[in-house]
Each structure stands twice: as structure tokens, then as C-alpha cells.
Amino acid sequence: MPTITLPDGSQRSFDHAVSVADVALSIGAGLAKATVAGKVDGKLVDACDLIENDASLQIITPKDAEGLEIIRHSCAHLVGHAVKQLYPTAKMVIGPVIDDGFYYDIAYERPFTPDDLAAIEQRMQQLIEKDYDVIKKVTPRAEVIEVFTARHEDYKLRLVEGMPDEQAMGLYYHEEYVDMCRGPHVPNTRFLKSFKLTKLSGAYWRGDAKNEQLQRVYGTAWADKKQLAAYIQRIEEAEKRDHRKIGKRLGLFHTQEEAPGMVFWHPQGWTLYQVLEQYMRKVQRENGYLEIKTPQVVDRSLWEKSGHWANYADNMFTTQSESRDYAIKPMNCPCHVQVFNQGLKSYRELPLRLAEFGACHRNEPSGALHGIMRVRGFTQDDAHIFCTEDQMQAESAAFIKLTLDVYADFGFKDIELKLSTRPEKRVGSDELWDRAESALASALDSAGLPYDLQPGEGAFYGPKIEFSLKDCLGRVWQCGTLQLDFNLPIRLSAEYVSEDNSRKNPVMLHRAILGSFERFIGILIEHYEGAFPAWLAPTQAVIMNITDKQADFALEVEKTLAESGFRAKSDLRNEKIGFKIREHTLLKVPYLLVIGDREVEMQTVAVRTREGADLGSMPVAQFAEFLAQAVSRRGRQDTE
């Protein structure tokens, strides 16, 4: 006679084993109809699963985060059902849940087309309309092998082979289609109505480019049509803001097949890049950082000492010269330790903050490359702080403040922070971990900042803080990192002379604010839709004459603004002024200065914004002062 305790503390007793669905029905028919699954003693189970002993139970509905994830997972299975009906020779691989949706990897003799994607979606809708029950059967291993052998599902058999300890597995039946999964899944297809297939892409079996290529069908699913419509609207807005399209339209950069994952910066884009670099250089100098430059190609021996060769070799570009193995650096930290090691340091010299705009290269899979957001060649705003254990908290607090100030200058105020603590496998004593975790937590607390605790998610060599910023579409981008490291200074023999004259290893704080210039610029492009604040805009003002008679004065204005440190240019083409205004508005230039005969006579400029606001005529010096104020605000105001 199980007694079921519900979240409100109420209890229900039954004289026999009872399913989650039956408990829901005993509460009410409406709840029973909305039941997706259950959480029994904290563990997610299917609605059909029996509860035989006393237990706590939470009924999971589409309104719960877990319910939405289950809906998405079941939609992936529905993709399998539709694909097997339309393309019987296709072989199904895996179909997991991802952020905002799901995908299914499929092996098929030809590439799927957009027409195929539409056909699969239509068949899924037809299957949903049949309103059939999804049947779960816990099946012995040998029978699972028989089922997938009879269906020629080679990849499912390989997955079973990779789970030698599993003697029974969950099979979920969508009518004639069967898939293997730990579950749980929806009890009926009526929960899957609010979905949409979104795109196709390539993938590799087990994510390894050496393996056979597969096709990936992506989709999204939501609890109701309203949520789906809102998501589709966000996606359409994101597509409008795609940094690749805007980058091409504004002449910022391009990529091409001959240099996959590498960026060709154009004059406008390189100007933007340099503005970021000069800003970060100034900020770091003001906060006690010393800028250095280290080699890009380094002998294998250093990477072996640091541990990167053993753990990261597949992601490193390597070469040989004179019988020696080299790697192009994927990160800067081992080289920064070499700078620290030149000359024995005293505790009086700590903390030592070494910064580098370090060019790094990583051999990312070609399928993962994405514009300038995911590249093989990139530059980090990288720095390493070498300090004593007693200095960890103060250095962490200073970095947190610096990072939030930088994000605010770029217009990002909504920042999420995560503190990741010790994993099971780690180096260093528990006492050292206690101090390190306490230092990071205290630094966050002293700043009055809320944060999510991620137990066990730290690196084996130290805890870390992650900084994620939220853009105008509500998307979250993880950019900044503060990582404490007890291990690398020991591996690379970094030492300092302590106050008692003994030699000790410093604590090393790996830190970055932007992450990489390339990715951060991509985020900025999408956040601002290319309409950068005046301080970032590659061209801050364009001066346009109405006729040739005003050309000389236009050039004078350009020179005056340039001498004041502004990025201004003249457009003296023999085009109608309306045409010029439209063109530079589309190029997102913040300020458009029009000069006609009256402006020449009065020695003024007629000022318009890219948004179409008419600011009137003003002397050049007054506009320069106005522009200087706009630049000084940086991104801390949305409108200027």
C-alpha cells in the first residue's frame, strides 16, 4: 500500500502499486490530461511507471522545465517516426535535446533538401493528429538486439554494443516505429503539437570527423503555440541580426574556404577591432597589468610539461622543423609562465599581472565553424595574475569589478555569474580548495552579486567564475572567465621567495573579459544589429555635400574632426543628397552631416542621426563637443 506525498505535503494512499498517471487522475481529470511524466523521490519517470512503495511525487506538466525538455525529446523520436515512413532505408542514430529544441542524426544515401525537411515536418503533423499513445517497454538486452537487427538499424546496434553493462533497455514505440532511450517520454502525441523543424546540417558519427558523415535535422518544440510563435519571432530577429550578413553588408570582414575558420578583416572591421584593442589596453594599464608578447610557435617539450600535449593534442596545429616538433599555441598560459620564470621573484613583486592580446589557433572541426563566432584563429584578451594565496580574494574582487565595468561600457548590464567548485578528481589539498572557493565566493558576495553555484564543475586544478552576458534578444553568451590554478605553476616550476625566505609556487589566476576579440565583435554586431554606439562605430560621422560648391568646406570639416580624434570621412560623389543619406544610413553611420550653401555661409553643418532625427545646424566645434560627449558615454546609454 504505497503512500504518495505530494509537493503541498498532502498524502494519498493506494492499496496497490500505482502509476504516475493514476495518481494524477485521482487528483483530477484535468491534471491527468496534462501529465507528461512524474518525479518520484527526485527522479524523473514515465507517466506509466508504477510506484510500489511510499514515495514523494511531483506531477510534471508542460508548464515545468522538465516537461518541456521531455516534449522536445519526444519530438526527436517523432522525427524518427516520420523519417522512417518517408525514407525507409534511412538509419536512425541519436536524437538528444539541446537548448530550445532537439535534433536527430540520420544516415541516408543522399543529402536531405529543404523540400525533404518540409515533408518530414508535414508527416510529423499528420502523425500528431492521429493522437496515438507512446508505449514504453523495458526490454531485455538480447531482445533489443533482435529488434534493431530485424530493422537493420546498424547505429542503434552500435549504441547497444557501447553499453555492455545495460541488461535491459527502454524501448519507446510510436506505432510501428521504435526507438531506444532512457526516457522519460510523453504518453501521447497530443503534447507535441507546438513544434517546428528549423534547419539541416551535417554531423559525424560520435562527433569525430574521421567517422562517417551523417545528416542532422534540427527542430524546436514548446508547451503551446504562443510560446512557439514567440520563439520563431526571436529566431527571425536573430537571423536579421546574423553577424555574417551584417558583416558583409557593412564591409567589416569575410571568411572563405581557402582559410577555414580564419578571418579576413576589411578596413571598417579592422578599425572596430583596433578600437576594442586600444580600449582594453588602456583599461588593463589603468588596472596594473603589464602587457607582454609571446611566441606563437613553441616546441613540443613545453606543451608536454604543461600537460596540453597529452590532453589537447587533437586540437593543436603542429609542424616540424629540423627534426623538432612544434605546435602553434592554442592558449597563452604556458608562455606567460615562462615570462614569470625569468628571474626569481620576491613576494614583494606579487601580484604580478601579465596581459597579452594573444593570437591563438585551435583545430576546431569544420562543421563547428560559424562566421567569426567560432573560428580556428583568434585573439584573446588574455592575462594571468601570479599571486600569493593571501592575495586571491583581493585580486578576484578587483577582476570582478573590472569585468562588470567593461561590460557596462559595451552596453551589457544583465550579467549572469556562475561559481564552479571542486570536482571529485583534483589536485591540491582540501584546505587550499577551501581557501580558493571561499576567496571567489567572498569576492562575489562583497560585490553584492547573485550567482549560481555549480558544485563539482570546477577544473581539476582550481575553482572558477564564469561571466555570461545577455544580449537584446535575451540570448546568453559566456565570455569572461576567472580560473584559479594551483597546478600549472607547479608543473612549470614557477616559484617566488616568500616572506620567510622559502620558495613557494604562486597561485595563477587565468582571466579573460571579452574571451576572444572575434567572438565578442560577433556578439556586438548582433546585439546592436550593426548600429554601434558612437565610440565603437568604424565611421563616426560622414560629411556630405549637396553640390560641388561645398566640397572644399566638407573637406575642411573632415580635417577638423579628424584632428580632434574622430573617425570622419567625406562623401563628395556627384550623387543626390537623398541617395547619400540613404546609403550611409544603411551603413549605420551614427551621424550624417549635410552641407549646402547655407552651411558654407554660416560655417555650420546640418546634423542628422542614422535613426532619422534632425538635430539642426550647428558650428563644427559644437558638433565636435556633442560627438565627444556621445563617445565618452560609450555604450552606457542606448540612445545618443
UniProtKB/Swiss-Prot annotation:
Enumerate the Pfam families for this protein: HGTP_anticodon, TGS, tRNA-synt_2b, tRNA_SAD
Q: How is the cofactor bound?
A: Binds 1 zinc ion per subunit.
Q: Name one GO molecular function term.
A: tRNA binding
One GO location term (cellular component) = cytosol
Q: Which cofactor does it need?
A: Zn(2+)
Q: Does the keyword Metal-binding apply?
A: yes
Question: Where are the membrane-spanning stretches?
Answer: none
Q: PROSITE patterns from the xrefs?
A: AA_TRNA_LIGASE_II, TGS
Sequence segments annotated as region (Catalytic) = 242-533
Q: Enumerate the catalysed reactions.
A: tRNA(Thr) + L-threonine + ATP = L-threonyl-tRNA(Thr) + AMP + diphosphate + H(+)
Assigned keywords, A-Z: Aminoacyl-tRNA synthetase, ATP-binding, Cytoplasm, Ligase, Metal-binding, Nucleotide-binding, Protein biosynthesis, RNA-binding, tRNA-binding, Zinc
Tell me the domain of life. Answer: Bacteria
Q: Cite the CDD domains for this sequence.
A: TGS_ThrRS, ThrRS_anticodon, ThrRS_core
Annotated Zn(2+) binding sites: 333, 384, 510
Subcellular localization(s) per the UniProt record: Cytoplasm
Q: Which residues form the TGS domain?
A: 1-61
| Gene Ontology biological-process entries | threonyl-tRNA aminoacylation
Q: What is its EC number?
A: 6.1.1.3
Classification via PANTHER family: THREONINE--TRNA LIGASE, CHLOROPLASTIC_MITOCHONDRIAL 2, THREONINE-TRNA LIGASE
Assembly with partners or alone: Homodimer.
Q: What does this protein do?
A: Catalyzes the attachment of threonine to tRNA(Thr) in a two-step reaction: L-threonine is first activated by ATP to form Thr-AMP and then transferred to the acceptor end of tRNA(Thr). Also edits incorrectly charged L-seryl-tRNA(Thr).
**What HAMAP family is this protein classified in?**
Thr_tRNA_synth (MF_00184)
**Which family is annotated?**
Belongs to the class-II aminoacyl-tRNA synthetase family.
This one is known as: Threonine--tRNA ligase
Q: From what organism does this protein derive?
A: Pseudomonas syringae pv. tomato (strain ATCC BAA-871 / DC3000)
Q: Which gene encodes it?
A: thrS
